[in-house]
């Protein structure tokens, strides 16, 4: 795969989270091959993005050991996700991508809820850099006008506050 000119690898770790495995089982079952996969990417100058919507909080210290590049798709409304703890624990070592709920906020929420969610995510995750504002998972812009409106609202709020004017 890497010989084909890949620049970036995204691993969907949804079924590797503590929603299914204890941290000790995660270390036993996944750590070794994940570390090999990440190191292989880095030797080829390929960045590595690890997605995990929920169940990541008990694994944050292990994430620092794995040394992947981006932790993404985390959702603040799922499984006790703590944005401040994520930033404090892994935000110096890993780029962070996510922080806004896709379904309840972007697909079903009001513009006020979107604004509050964006400001909360940026306030908790952007300090010191290394943060990419994004939904916790995919959104479907063709679903209805609410989703489209809220997607553009997320971007507009980010543009208003991106230079530290929260």
Question: Predicted regions span which residues?
Answer:
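Active-site loop segments of alpha/beta catalytic cores
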Residues: 1-166
């Amino acid at each position: 795969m890497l010989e084909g000119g890949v620049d970036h690898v995204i691993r969907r770790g949804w079924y590797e989270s503590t929603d299914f495995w204890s941290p000790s089982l995660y270390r036993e079952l996944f750590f070794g091959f994940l570390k090999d996969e990440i190191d292989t990417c880095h030797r080829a100058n390929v960045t590595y993005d690890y997605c995990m919507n929920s169940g990541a909080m008990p694994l944050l210290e292990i994430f620092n050991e794995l040394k992947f590049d981006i932790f993404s798709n985390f959702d603040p409304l799922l499984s006790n996700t703590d944005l401040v703890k994520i930033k404090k624990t892994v935000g110096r070592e890993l780029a962070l991508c996510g922080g806004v709920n896709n379904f309840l906020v972007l697909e079903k929420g009001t513009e006020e809820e979107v604004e509050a969610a964006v400001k909360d995510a940026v306030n908790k995750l952007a300090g010191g850099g290394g943060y990419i504002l994004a939904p916790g998972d995919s959104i479907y812009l063709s679903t209805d006008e609410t989703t489209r409106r809220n997607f553009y609202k997320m971007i507009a709020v980010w543009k208003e506050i991106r230079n530290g004017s929260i």
